[in-house]
Amino acid sequence: MSITITLEQDEALVLFELLASEKLEASVDTPERNALWALEGLLEKQLAEPFSPNYSELLQEARQSLLERYGR
């Protein structure tokens, strides 16, 4: 069984960066880590931005967009 999750582009990019950064690595158990790796892989397949030469700028814009939308 699978599910579908819909994210805005900026949400997906910021989430991908969090997962790829391994900031959560030490704080989760193996089953959760495996699920996060699967999610990271799915996002990586969908996003072009991480492979862009101006990735840092695109990521900063996405972060700013989320702050404006949801607040701090």
What feature does the model see in each segment?
Residues 1-6, 13-72:
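Positively charged, low-complexity terminal tracts
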